[in-house]
Curated annotation (Swiss-Prot):
It comes from Aspergillus candidus. InterPro entries: Indolamine_dOase (IPR000898), Trp/Indoleamine_2_3_dOase-like (IPR037217). The keyword Iron applies. Its cofactor is heme. One of its GO terms (biological process) is 'de novo' NAD biosynthetic process from L-tryptophan. The lineage of its organism: Eukaryota, Fungi, Dikarya, Ascomycota, Pezizomycotina. Belongs to the indoleamine 2,3-dioxygenase family. This is Indoleamine 2,3-dioxygenase acdA. SUPFAM superfamilies: Indolic compounds 2,3-dioxygenase-like.
Length: 405
């Protein structure tokens, strides 16, 4: 088993201050003039969304290589830009497109391979690498990542509702990200049999998740359910279900420069792709196969890791090997304070998931009942039946709490 001193979390592109968000704000524009065509296209597409010209502009975009991308933030910007363009191309029209041109598909495939995630829009392109602090906060990360101090770089709709939606997600990521160094210290404390240190951190974790839940509840301040449902949500859908009722294989055809290509089926962007939430599960020992009802969804949690940046996925795999906190806690008597503190921490994660369920109902289910929408409102943007999935994730977390004496 790896020793904590051998692990440098920055090697996994994880910040000790804000977790899976990049330590330095994402680029707002690719610096090399070679990529001006990409940046100009995205700036033309956003205002023209809905008038039928977005695909026309993208079809005019030059086919560029990734050879002039140098540093990691440039790769992040390229992935964000290309994946958003792919979403606009698929969904901005009366009917979804079942193809994306080589000018998007070819570099998107290359960039995604470099970053180790699927070549489609994801939580990383919507949130991690597309939200940045605005204003001057120096090294005060807590202030910089309050939702009101965040701004969106590239938008689908140009609405403040969309910006607020993703700013809330980024604020939650930053809030929980600062727990990561303490997780390593707590795993080491459990190895050493230091119950007091483990108990203290569980209290810290519970408080942090409670604040994450408060951040989530702020969604209502700046994102109207109707705007999210009708304007933002359609662009978060995946291409997996496109053409599923025709003679084609289904999904989206990624064209290449020689005129050929390949069919791909990918889910849409979803908070289930948050590495932070899966990390909390891993650290606390939440087992998503613990209930019979959740069996069909167990694989979905694993599938969502393929939509995470490769280094983040490797980090979760590392933490899965190291995690020992639940096992350590259960070695204590039923009445021990450490078991009570563990259950409190787990209960806060249950509350976060319950809040998410309520919000999903208000923003999607209730909006779907108010009017018709051609796309299935029972499915989340990640492509699964989302209410049963959210309920089962909550129930598995609840089942993780220590039995009461």
């Amino acid at each position: 088993m790896a020793d904590r001193s051998d692990i440098i979390i920055e090697n996994y592109q994880v910040s000790p201050r804000i977790g899976f968000l990049p330590d330095k704000p994402p680029l707002a524009r690719l610096p090399h003039p070679y990529y001006a065509g990409w940046e100009e296209t995205i700036s033309r597409v956003a205002p023209s969304r809905g008038d039928g010209r977005a695909r026309e502009y993208i079809d005019e975009m030059p086919l560029l290589s990734t050879g002039k991308l140098r540093v990691l933030p440039e790769w992040h910007r390229a992935y964000t830009l290309l994946s958003i363009l792919s979403q606009v191309y698929i969904w901005d029209g009366d009917e979804p497109s079942n193809r994306i041109p080589a000018s998007i598909a070819s570099p998107l495939l290359a960039v995604s391979e470099h970053l180790g995630l699927n070549p489609c829009a994801s939580f990383a392109s919507f949130c991690l690498w597309n939200i940045r602090p605005v204003g001057r906060h120096g090294l005060n990360y807590a202030a910089a990542y309050e939702p009101e101090n965040l701004g969106q770089i590239t938008s689908f709709t140009g609405t403040t509702d969309e910006e607020w939606f993703f700013s809330i997600s980024a604020a939650i990521e930053a809030r929980g990200g600062c727990l990561i160094p303490g997780m390593f210290d707590t795993i080491e404390a459990a190895r050493e049999g230091n119950s007091q240190r483990v108990q203290e951190f569980l209290g810290t974790l519970a408080s942090c998740v409670r604040h994450m839940c408060k951040d989530l509840k702020r969604m209502y301040e700046g994102c109207a359910p109707s705007v999210f449902y009708h304007d933002v949500r359609p662009f978060l859908n995946g291409g997996k279900g496109v053409n599923k009722d025709t003679q084609t294989p289904g999904g989206v055809f990624y064209e290449n420069e020689s005129g050929g290509g390949q069919w791909h089926q990918y889910q849409g962007g979803s908070n289930a792709q948050s590495s932070l939430i899966q990390l909390l599960d891993i650290f606390l020992g939440v087992d998503h196969s613990i209930t019979a009802a959740n069996k069909p969804h167990e694989g979905y949690h694993r599938e969502m890791q393929s939509y995470m940046p490769g280094k983040h996925r490797q980090f979760l795999q590392l933490m899965s090997r190291l995690s020992n906190v639940r096992e350590f806690v259960l070695c204590h008597p039923v009445t021990a304070e450490i078991r009570i503190e563990y259950s409190r921490a787990t209960a806060e994660l249950v509350a976060l998931r319950q809040t998410h369920m309520i919000m999903a109902s208000r923003y999607i289910v209730m909006q779907g009942r108010k009017g018709s929408m051609c796309r299935d409102s029972s499915k989340g943007t990640g492509g699964t039946e989302f209410m049963p999935f959210l309920k089962d994730a909550r129930d598995c977390t609840l089942a993780t709490c220590c039995p009461r004496p």
